[in-house]
Amino acid sequence: MTVSFLEQGQGTPLVLLHGIGSAARSFDRVIAAFAPRFRVVAWDAPGYGDSTDLPMEHPTAGDYADALAVFLDEMGVQSCHLLGHSLGCLMAARFAATRPERVLSLTLCSIAAGQANLPAEERQKLLDQRIGDLAALGPQGMAEKRAPRLLGPAASPEALDRLKDTMGSVRPHGYGQAAHMLSTTDIKADVRKLPPSLPGQVIYGDADVITPPERNRDVAAVWPGVAAHVIPGAGHALYLEQPGTFNALLAAFLSKSTS
């Protein structure tokens, strides 16, 4: 399997997992901020960027976690600080739940909790709507429609342009595979399996209409000892929208986790 990625810096690895309508390059400001202290690695998930698709038609969160394990092995990363955003949270939580010895800390941002607990009819409707938008509009058209909803009311035009750029680059098959995974996963089941000793934090925006604050709080509620932080005014794409505040929260958390 081929995986495209961005890498910068030396030291303890910090691994970044993007969301369903995104790409490794969306983390460029996070990478730049942390490269002086960490070896920062952001992958393009399977089916994104130049990464090959997963071989199964409807991969599970476990399949993405397995792919991440292989990728990290190839990178020589035995353990890391792990961060997931949105759909990336599902991959990160599954990886941490099944390979806790490889995770030094876990940060979940703008949590996509998964839809496994919804009625089957509702799950299928949401899946059809998501895949249907991409089929009807194409990646660029979908980005024009969806990207504005990922930002808070005070977001800059630059943040919107960056969102449209990454969302407009998705590949339909990889996006469809990720959408199926979202439809069949329950992140709480994985979070409940995390070892109590694992440092964890949740970061979310109070203006997020994609994964609303209560959804993030619900996940935090089943994660004993987790630190939960809200960024006022931030929408779903909080690390693009308010990079200074986001990076400060992450830096403070990592400082405590490595002390």
Task: Identify what each model region corresponds to.
Residues 6, 29-35, 41-84, 97-98, ...:
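Active-site loop/oxyanion-hole signature of alpha/beta-hydrolase fold enzymes
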Residues 194, 202-204, 208:
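Short beta-strand/loop motif that positions the catalytic acidic residue
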Residues 84, 88, 92:
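Gly/Ala-rich beta-loop-alpha elbow adjacent to hydrolase catalytic centers
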Residues 1-15, 35-39, 77-78, 108, ...:
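Alpha/beta-hydrolase fold catalytic core
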Residues 117-123, 136-193:
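Conserved alpha/beta-hydrolase catalytic His-Asp/Glu region
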Residues 234-243, 247:
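Catalytic histidine-centered segment of alpha/beta-hydrolase-like enzymes
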Residues 93, 97-98, 103-136:
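Flexible "cap/lid" loop of the alpha/beta hydrolase fold
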Residues 19-22, 86:
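Active-site glycine-rich loops that stabilize anionic/oxyanionic intermediates
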